[in-house]
Amino acid sequence: LVNKIAQAREINKAHTTFIDTILKHSHKGRIHADINQLRSDNGGTVTGRFSYSNPNLQQIPARNKDLGPRIRALFIPEKDHTWGCFDYSQQEPRLVVHYATLQNLYGVGDVSDSYNNDSNTDFHDIVAKMAGIPRLQAKTINLGLFYGMGKNKLQAELGVSKDKATELFRQYHNKVPFVKQLMDNVSSRAQDRGQIRTLLGRLCRFPLWEPNQFGIHKALPHEQALIEHGPGIKRAYTYKALNKL
């Protein structure tokens, strides 16, 4: 009974949130959604990340194996046209290795050499071998640190006990020191200058910066500083690629 209720709620949410909204904004069989590049009264993000409204196409479900394909099947390309799906391979890890190499941080040399010798290098696999931990755990820690995730949240993502998480972090930072060093440098820059400028010139200010020890009870500006450095640069390269297309 509980599963049936949960399933009914999921179907109702899909209908009211997605299907009704899509039909509402449909005009002659087409959807003309608003693409927000900057924050405004009509939507958008303060970081400059693309967002959609009327309807929000980024919320079209994908994980539900039954409802997802059915709702996404509503969208088809124009006649004689084909849709493409493009994605950079491990964008964040490549940027981390790039900037860690520029700063000559300890431990990044072997990873940088791997990228130079093989463009298909798997960063998470290399880090897993360096730290002596499973690849999935290495990937979770990598992405968590790139985005300024605190220890408690990382522990929850890893699904391990506090003691096990502490041991994993210790092992990771001892064997892969350049990731934490780079994140600390970004945090220090935001603290000293009160701002970070992205590759495309976007200025992100931190007037309420609260310095804290890395990864422990992080303040929101700390997370924002890391997001503006790595993912902010990632967005810049993605925008350039979109313009070329």
Describe the residue ranges of each PLM region.
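Conserved catalytic core of nucleotide polymerization and phosphodiester-bond processing enzymes
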Residues: L1-L245
